[in-house]
Amino acid sequence: DLPLSRGLGDVYKRQIMVNAPFQWIDVDPFGSPVSFLDSAIQSISRVGVLEVTATDTAALCGSAKTSAARRYGSTGIVDSYMYDDATRILLATIARIAAMHDKSIHTILSLFDGHHVRVSVLLKKSKEIASEWRNNIGYRIRSQPYHFSDQPSGKFSGPMWTGPIFNAEIIQRMTVERALKICAGQESDYPADWSEKDIEHSRREIERTVRHLSESASLLSQDHLLVAIDDLGAAAGIGQLPSMKAMKQGLAERGFEMAHCQMPEPMFATDADWDTVLDVAKSSK
């Protein structure tokens, strides 16, 4: 793990990475990670893990369009899908740079958490697979509610990664017990002014996050429909928003899966089509 941040040591850190192969690199700067990606990707061995954090969420989410175009060559839209767009735009940038070095990316975990984007990918050296990187690049077209296309049209965001954003086999190995052991810390790790209530709240947040990641891993590892609960009422023409529980039960009765996603806004993923989602929402009012 070679922590990277902008400062006097940046050139030195890049030189270290280029001169020695690593199996695991974590790029975690303040702001955009773009200037570090080329060196980091070159420095990964034939098979290795690259983790990237981006805090320039205004660019990735679409509110800073000139920065997005300059850094990522992409455009975003400020709406319910901007958080998912942000992770996919970052993944597309990593995939493009990796392909320049004959490497392909295989997503492990991608999420928008608080005020940053965090992605983990497995890099593999392969000219043949790297040459196919564009097969997973496209645009999110705002239709009903959206679809991915390899060409932009109408109201769109992208280009972005349109392939899987999770690896279910890996993510489903996560357990609440293990996460609490690693992330919750010891009593000496907590701020001095934290009460028992604060500590308990922190533990519950860890449990909730791991549960959502584990439950959604299977769907996010394949083609899926992402639905924003706050948009569903208007789309279905109903006044009261259906609960997540009611939607999950209704979709299950029709033979479909659904999982609550770890997003800043209430969203779920499903393998159902949009018309089925609307029918369930109307029957759940």
Feature map (PLM): residue ranges:
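Single conserved hydrophobic/aromatic residue that forms the stacking wall/gate
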Residues: 1-12
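A short acidic, Gly/Pro-enriched loop at the edge of an enzyme's catalytic core
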Residues: 15-23
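A short SAM/SAH-binding and catalytic strip from SAM-dependent methyltransferases
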Residues: 22-35
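A short glycine-rich, Lys/Arg-flanked "PGG" loop and its adjoining helix->strand segment in the class I
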Residues: 37-48
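Conserved beta-strand signature within the Rossmann-like core of class I S-adenosyl-L-methionine
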Residues: 47-56
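Conserved Class I S-adenosyl-L-methionine
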Residues: 67-80
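Short alpha-helix
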Residues: 86-99
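Polybasic, low-complexity RNA-engagement segments
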Residues: 114-119, 124-285
